[in-house]
Amino acid sequence: MQSDIEYVISRHKTLYYAERHLSGTFSAYVDKIVYSFVHQFNPQTDCLNILECNGAPAGSIAIAKADDETAQLRFFMLEPEMRQRGFGNRLMDMALQFCRDKGYKKVFLLTITAQVIARHVYETHGFYKVCSEDKSEWGDGVIEERWELEIVE
């Protein structure tokens, strides 16, 4: 799992900086949330899935228990060459099935408005935006959004 965690940290920092010009404050935030996930990880309530292509990591998605009925979707990321090829939907389907299997009633996630393709995947899977917050400390004009999904059995 250590190499998976290193991949998640490295690629989130690299891609968000290159594609969204997010600051070092965001990089520190990534370190904090990933290490918190690792420290609290329980395979009965949490999961981390790494997409591989030709033996190399090519994307990630995770589920973390927020409370007994709520999960947080985290670390959803695809390498640029893997985007818009259906892999994001596959990762999302796997993560949401894990939530159903574990009996979660709701899933939430945090994203930024600039993540247009990811936001489309969220909408396609039934998530809806519930609120937004200025995160200018991460970069100019960065707005973080909270999206939620009620899980229907």
PLM region descriptions:
Residues 1, 105-153:
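C-terminal "cap" of GNAT-fold acetyltransferases
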Residues 1-81, 89-94, 98, 102, ...:
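Acetyl-CoA-dependent GNAT
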